[in-house]
Amino acid sequence: MQGQTIRIRLKAFDYRVLDASTQEIVNTAKRTGAQVRGPIPLPNKIEKFTVLRGPHIDKKSRDQWEIRTHKRLLDIVDPTPQTVDALMKLDLAAGVDIQIKV
């Protein structure tokens, strides 16, 4: 698989779980002989929600909530067949969304 690049995008709400999963992917790729570029931290997406506290009248009383989505980018350059097999068998945390492009 010379000249190919595998691009992996990871998303999670908790940055600690995201960093642990990223480190696990990097260690697996390096152990099988592939070159890794990254992890590159991408901008966080912050969604803010404003809701009324009470069900009836008091419009001035509100709560604000936010969800932060943390993202990382990895490039695996010139992956070997062993690298692809190891990445397919890798078991990552449940809270991490993974997108892979070859």
From Swiss-Prot:
Question: What Gene3D superfamilies does the annotation carry?
Answer: Ribosomal protein S10 domain (3.30.70.600)
Which keywords accompany this UniProt record?
Ribonucleoprotein, Ribosomal protein
Which first-to-last residue range defines the signal peptide? none
The protein's name: Small ribosomal subunit protein uS10
What SUPFAM superfamilies does the record tag this protein with?
A: Ribosomal protein S10 (SSF54999)
A Pfam family for this UniProt protein? Ribosomal_S10
Q: Does the keyword Ribonucleoprotein apply?
A: yes
One GO process term, biological-process aspect: translation
InterPro entries according to UniProt = Ribosomal_uS10, Ribosomal_uS10_dom, Ribosomal_uS10_dom_sf
PANTHER family assigned: 30S RIBOSOMAL PROTEIN S10 FAMILY MEMBER
